């Protein structure tokens, strides 16, 4: 069963909540007004480290189990510590538009072949039922060869999920890790007047 985080109603300012060890936030949805909430700092940070900052989450508010998607994680400009979170409450069957991250695995295999991955796109915008949308897309690039590329159209996330990015957009290209500037001609200083 997925971890359920406890949210509590917040009546104080965000700064006060942070001093008490909470991360303040707001929850909103199709049939609800925005509501100020708090999450216990340590538990929310552990959840975000494990699931990511653009994931679905199960939480409890006033004894009621709810599901939401993380829309934004606010960070302090100097320390980059988390200072706020915005959550859109959704039902499993509700259609939502959401940005999900792309993760790459298999970089070690590429390195053994003296190849590396040039990443051009790290997330895609999708729409579908909340229950059908994955928290992320993981691409295994370990078996790809020099010059091969992955495009948005190559993603396999289900026919019931609409992707808003251009299908021909390049996600990543496999390149050589060797120096590609072999034939750089140096200017002869004696030719300069």
Curated annotation (Swiss-Prot):
Gene3D superfamilies reported in the protein's UniProt record: Ribosomal protein L25, beta domain, Ribosomal Protein L25, Chain P
One of the record's GO cellular component terms: cytosolic large ribosomal subunit
Disulfide bridges in this chain: none
GO biological process entries: translation
Family annotation (SUPFAM superfamilies): Ribosomal protein L25-like
The keyword Magnesium is annotated on this UniProt entry: no
Ribosomal protein recorded as keyword: yes
GO terms of molecular function: 5S rRNA binding; structural constituent of ribosome
Keywords: Ribonucleoprotein, Ribosomal protein, RNA-binding, rRNA-binding
Alphabetized Pfam families for the sequence: Ribosomal_L25p, Ribosomal_TL5_C
Family that this chain belongs to: Belongs to the bacterial ribosomal protein bL25 family. CTC subfamily.
Function: This is one of the proteins that binds to the 5S RNA in the ribosome where it forms part of the central protuberance.
Oligomer and partners: Part of the 50S ribosomal subunit; part of the 5S rRNA/L5/L18/L25 subcomplex. Contacts the 5S rRNA. Binds to the 5S rRNA independently of L5 and L18.
Name the UniProt record assigns to this protein: Large ribosomal subunit protein bL25
Gene that encodes it: rplY
């Amino acid at each position: 069963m997925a971890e359920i985080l406890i949210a509590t109603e917040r009546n104080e300012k965000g700064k006060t909540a942070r001093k008490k060890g909470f991360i303040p936030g707001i929850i909103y949805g199709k049939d609800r007004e925005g509501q100020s909430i708090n999450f216990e700092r340590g538990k929310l940070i552990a959840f975000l480290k494990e699931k990511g900052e653009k994931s679905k989450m199960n939480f409890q508010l006033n004894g009621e189990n709810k599901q939401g998607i993380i829309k934004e994680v606010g960070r302090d400009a100097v320390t980059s510590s988390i200072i706020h979170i915005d959550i859109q409450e959704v039902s499993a069957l509700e259609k939502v538009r959401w940005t999900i991250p792309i993760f790459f695995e298999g970089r070690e295999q590429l390195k053994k072949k003296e190849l590396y991955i040039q990443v051009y796109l790290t997330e895609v915008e999708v729409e579908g039922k909340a229950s059908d949308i994955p928290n992320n897309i993981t691409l295994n690039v370990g078996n790809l060869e020099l010059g091969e590329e992955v495009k948005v159209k190559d993603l396999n996330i289900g026919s019931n999920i609409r992707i808003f990015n251009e299908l021909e957009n390049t996600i990543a290209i496999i390149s050589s890790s060797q120096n590609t500037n072999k034939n750089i001609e140096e200017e002869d200083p004696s030719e300069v007047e």
